[in-house]
UniProtKB/Swiss-Prot annotation:
Cleaved propeptide residues: 111
N-acetylserine: residues bearing it: S112
Protein name per the record: Pro-opiomelanocortin B
Species annotation: Oncorhynchus mykiss
Gene of this entry: pomcb
The keyword Signal is assigned to this record: yes
Residues with Isoleucine amide modification: I124
Protein purpose: Melanocyte-stimulating hormone alpha: Anorexigenic peptide. Increases the pigmentation of skin by increasing melanin production in melanocytes. Melanocyte-stimulating hormone beta: Increases the pigmentation of skin by increasing melanin production in melanocytes.
Pyrrolidone carboxylic acid PTM positions: Q37
Domain of life of the organism encoding this protein: Eukaryota
Amino acid sequence: MFGTFLQNQSVRLNMVCAPWLLAVVVVCVCNPGVEGQCWDSSHCKDLPSEDKILECIHLFRSGLQDESPEPRSAAQQSTEESLSLGILLAALTSGERALDADPEPHSDKRHSYSMEHFRWGKPIGHKRRPIKVYASSLEGGDSSEGTFPLQARRQLSSWEDEMVGALGNQGAKAQTKVVPRTLTVTGLQDKKDGSYRMGHFRWGSPTAIKRYGGFMKPYTQQSHKPLITLLKHVTLKNEQ
């Protein structure tokens, strides 16, 4: 695409430059006296620099202007001028027409630029594995297990197992998710009515033995032997 654009620009530049070059050639052909007389003389030959060449041309121009021109009729001058103007106008108009007319007009014929060399040019879906057809199965006419390759059979069996497992998991999830609404409502009401007990924690409902770290036992579990012995001692002292 970029190459075609450069070609179009170069063609346009050539079309524009051609008429101007033609105009310069016409001017030089109409007035050949200056360059011819300058380069024919011995003064302008073998000049070392461009400045001296320009000075030489300037001197010869001034000399030509001082000389009296040859007598020409008005008809000849008018015909020469009309010819030169006609050539210049024809060249300029042809250049303008070439600029206006596009060499490759924008139409539907131009192909759309498809970015096939990029990986996002043509997005491809899931890659489909090609199905391999073996000549032995075609020649035999039947697809028996002996002719079918072992690797392909293993792949098919693994794919079937995966599909069955995925379907089973989906069914189990669906069964666990489907819960009656009445049961959930009654469970929420029971929780609201009763006290919240942290049964899911280890310390939610500890046993009586392990309560308070096992150091403090309840009154019912304490032995009454020390109290009985104390009363016995008191009664014996009072009797004495």
